[in-house]
Amino acid sequence: MENANKPTFQNVLEFVRTFRRKNKLQREIADVEKKIRDNQKRVLLLDNLSDYIKPGMSVEAIQAIIADMRGNYEDRVDEYIIKNADLSKERRDLSKKLKALGEGEYKEEK
């Protein structure tokens, strides 16, 4: 009887290892994609900055351009923080709903 369960247990262990590896790869891929996007944005930012800065501009004019760009980016960050909070709240609400649904099914089985 024990021998009959052993291959099944090994199959379960292999499934768990494979599933964990797949999840780890997904996280690593997402991390690398984020790094690619971040660096592409940096390149674009430098290109945009080069378009604004002209020969003979004063240091004050360049600083004003940078300050304006910084303000715009800070506004975007604030918007994304608010959006992320809204999404997190919705995720928590769905988790509570799923938990309640799961508990309801468990009670019905008894």
From Swiss-Prot:
Its main location: cytoplasm. One of its GO terms (cellular component) is cytosol. Keywords: Coiled coil, Cytoplasm. It comes from the Bacteria. It is found in: Cytoplasm. Residues 15-42 form a coiled coil. Pfam families: DUF496. InterPro entries: DUF496, UPF0265. The keyword Coiled coil applies. Disulfide bonds: none annotated. Pole-localizer protein involved in the regulation of several cellular processes. Belongs to the pole-localizer TmaR family. This is Pole-localizer protein TmaR.
